[in-house]
Regions:
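Glycine-rich, charge-dense phosphate/pyrophosphate-binding loop(s)
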Residues: 155-238
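Alpha/beta catalytic cores of group-transfer enzymes, especially the acyltransferase/condensing modules
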Residues: 65-112, 184, 197-198, 203
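ATP-binding N-lobe of GHMP and related small-molecule kinases
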Residues: 1-39, 57, 61-63, 220, ...
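Acyltransferase
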Residues: 111-193
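Beta-strand segments within the central parallel beta-sheet cores of soluble alpha/beta enzyme folds
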Residues: 26-31, 65-76, 146, 166
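A short glycine/serine-rich beta->alpha loop
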Residues: 1, 32-42, 72-81, 134-139
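DPxDG-like acidic metal-binding loop motif
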Residues: 41-64, 88-90
Length: 238
């Protein structure tokens, strides 16, 4: 079941509030959440977005929401757009907030193989945030900005060499990797197998990106090779 179903309920009702419509009660017979919780994979955001999409589908009578309104509502409930944007639009997204939430989307190259390494243990986001420094140096901030732009482009182009060189972070991974027991194995594996390694979200899941299928196993960790969804979320009937 979906541990974040409360988020789904809140987001479902929020759509009716925004559209000034009476809430149409529904009964969720079964909610299947395939995204592991508390693993840095955006499970709560997926439930929030599901609630908005379900409400929008039920209200599909000429008074439904635009994609941008769906994005705004779901992001406001989540508190940031970082997970909502790729869930809704698919592909590779870069998001920020000014007067509202903004995102830009690009498609990820199919040259890459994405391997998720999911541990059996959880890491609370609050704990992952607690280890971060309150301030960072100007040089570290500049380094992350420049490398982030290159990382975005490398994923778009399918350039493995550029991706490996662009995947240099000075703001959070050095502080968080020590919280993830076993992470040193994946870091070393990536170095030896023409891959690059990063923390998914705040952790503890680790993402390996390569241009080939990786034959990797580690006791207590679930390994999954996933494909990129470049088209985003939608409602379908089974």
């Amino acid at each position: 079941s979906c541990s974040a179903s409360l988020g789904m309920d809140v987001s479902y009702e929020k759509v009716f509030e925004v559209l000034d419509e009476p809430i149409i009660p529904i009964k969720l017979v079964e909610v299947v959440q395939k995204i592991p919780t508390s693993r840095g994979l955006g499970s709560s955001a997926s439930c929030i977005l599901a609630g908005v999409l379900i409400a929008n589908d039920i209200l599909h009578n000429g008074n439904s929401l635009s994609q941008d309104m769906i994005f705004q509502i779901a992001s406001s409930i989540e508190g940031h757009p970082d997970n909502i944007a790729p869930l809704l639009f698919g592909g590779l997204t870069c998001s920020f907030k000014n007067d509202k939430y903004y995102t830009i989307k690009s498609e990820v190259s199919n040259n890459f193989k994405f391997t998720l390494c999911i541990p059996s243990f959880e890491l609370k986001t609050s704990d992952a945030r607690r280890v971060l420094p309150k301030e960072v140096s100007m040089s570290d901030a500049v380094s992350n900005i420049s490398h982030s732009v290159a990382l975005f482009k490398a994923l778009e182009l399918g350039d493995m060499e550029l991706l490996k060189n662009a995947n240099i972070d000075k703001l959070h991974q050095d502080y968080r990797f020590p919280l993830i027991k076993g992470s040193e194995y994946f870091i070393e594996f990536a170095k030896n197998n023409n891959a690059t390694c990063m923390i998914s979200g705040a952790g503890p899941t680790i993402l390996l990106i390569s241009n080939k299928t990786l034959n990797i196993q580690y006791d207590g960790w679930e390994i999954e090779e996933l494909k990129v969804n470049n088209f985003g979320a939608y409602i379908y009937e089974e």
